[in-house]
Structure formats: C-alpha cells, structure tokens
Amino acid sequence: MTQDYRVLLYYQYVPIEDGETFAQKHLADCKELGLKGRILVADEGINGTVSGTIEQTNAYMELMKNDPRFSSTIFKIDEAEQNAFKKMHVRYRPELVNLSLEDDVNPLELTGAYLDPKEFREAMLDENTVVIDARNDYEFDLGHFRGAIRPEIRSFRELPQWIRDNKEQFMEKRVLTYCTGGIRCEKFSGWLVREGFKDVGQLHGGIATYGKDPEVQGDLWDGQMYVFDSRIAVPINQKEHVIVGRDWFDGSPCERYINCGNPECNRQMLASEENEAKYLGACSHECRVHPNNRYIKAHQLSNQEVQERLALLEKDLAS
C-alpha cells in the first residue's frame, strides 16, 4: 500500500499569552488545512500529534515555522497509509503534562541533560546507570528499553511519589529517563534534579527520535512503541524485533491492544482476537457481566450466547 499520509509528533515549551484564544484560532487553522489530530495548548506551550496528507502536513509545519514562538519546533515524522485520527481537536489545559506537583517545574529553567540517541545508548550500557521509563504502565508493557525500570504506576502523575518511595535505590546512580516524544521527560527530569539527583539525563526527542536515528537504529529497544492514535503500536528497533508484550489472559507473546469492554473500567490490555472473543472483551468476570459491555453490544450477542460463553469459560478456568 502507498504511504500517502504522515503523522507529525511535536511539542514546544514556550510562553503563550491567552492560550484559550490561541487554541480556538489554531483549531480553525488546522481544520482549514484539513488535518486530523489532537493538540493541547497551555500557557506554557503546545503539544500535538496531527495527521494528514503530505501536502497538508507540509502546510502545517510551514504555518508553525512562520510563528516566531514555534520556529524552532522539531517535528517527528512518520509515514502512514491513512489518517491516524478521525477528528481534529485543539484543547486548552492548565499545563501540558500533569505531574500533580504543588510547585510545578518550568523546563525552560530546569531540566535534565539532553542526550542524543548515540549518547543515550552508550549511557544505558554503563553499569552505574539506571533507566527509568516515564510513561504509563500499559505503554511500558508493549515495549521498552532493555533493562529499564517499570515504575508501578497507572498514570504519569503518580511518578513523583513512586520515585520518593524508591529514592534510595537511585540516589547514587546516574539516572536516565525517556518517554514517547520527550515532553514528559522535560518536566520529569527537571523535577529529579530539584529532588537532589546529581546526574540526570533525558533522551532528547524521545523514543520516536531514537528509532529513526540512522546510526543507533533503535538498538536495545524491545517490543513496540505505544502511540496515542489509531496505529496504537509503532516499530522502533530496526535490527531485531523482540516481543515483550504478554496477553492479559494467558501470558502468551502479544502486541495487540484492546480496551476492556466495560466502559467504566476501560483498562487497556494486550489480547489476541481469540482471547478477546473467549473472555467477551473484558478484563474480569465483573466486567464481562457488566450491562454495558461494549464487546457484547458490538457483536450483537444474545443473552443466551453470552451465558453459553460464560459457562464454557468457567468450565475452562476450572479445569
């Protein structure tokens, strides 16, 4: 298939006066260009992922470059076979990333040392270095750097407390951190410095940049990179593909993400099509029998069919 579309991932920490008004105008500009995607605007900057044709994405990058505030913005570009989003959203938020800090960190004033892909790879090989994944748990489970630490957190804002609880393990080490495109690490690495960590580095441009580096070629990355659009997973390691994801239900190698059928749960989990059907698209018995189970509704299963599947599942689990 032809790769007629592109996906742009970018961010820029820069003061934006009257961010709410800017967000409204920026949405109109994006719609006029025919783009689809999701952009967050705050007084501290902008963070976005947009998709469109080559012409549309070129026009958008030109639009951004012509604004002095965004003239230095670095775009990570992926080719795609179709639009990665269905709609275009530009939303104003109090901050671009939420660390739930009483005293927020300004990355323009305080952040960890930037490491390019080659420097980051070399630093990972040093035995006195610890690598901390700054993403959510479900992102880590799909793919991560070899030997990286998986914080026991469900969301980014829980990370500072986890670090405080485990601080003694890392204080005397060189600490490296990474995330998808780099924006979360800008703030998180600055917070680590403020907390007293002596040697803090961050992967400049994130995993997305690391995977495209012609020299490093994604080396030491296992699995795939989770992305917040319809693609879900993007390959990073150009040298070898090691599957690290495990099926939620049986632990077998898996890189296929679904959301739990219970809309009140909505847990993201890895599952094969076979297991999704077997477990009615839900992570637990409580979610399987939830009256609003989306899997049951989407497949128009009758109550009798549901009860038959539940009985078979119960029998299988008991054996």
Curated annotation (Swiss-Prot):
PROSITE patterns: RHODANESE_3
One Pfam family hit: UPF0176_N
Active site positions: C179
Keyword annotations of the record: Oxidoreductase, tRNA processing
Rhodanese domain mapped to chain residues: 125-219
One MF annotation (Gene Ontology) recorded for this entry: oxidoreductase activity, acting on paired donors, with incorporation or reduction of molecular oxygen
EC number: 1.14.-.-
Origin: domain of life: Bacteria
Coiled coil segments of this chain: none
Record-annotated disulphide pairs: none
Function: Catalyzes oxygen-dependent 5-hydroxyuridine (ho5U) modification at position 34 in tRNAs.
Recorded family membership: Belongs to the TrhO family.
Protein name: tRNA uridine(34) hydroxylase
Species annotation: Lactococcus lactis subsp. lactis (strain IL1403) (Streptococcus lactis)
Gene designation per UniProt: trhO
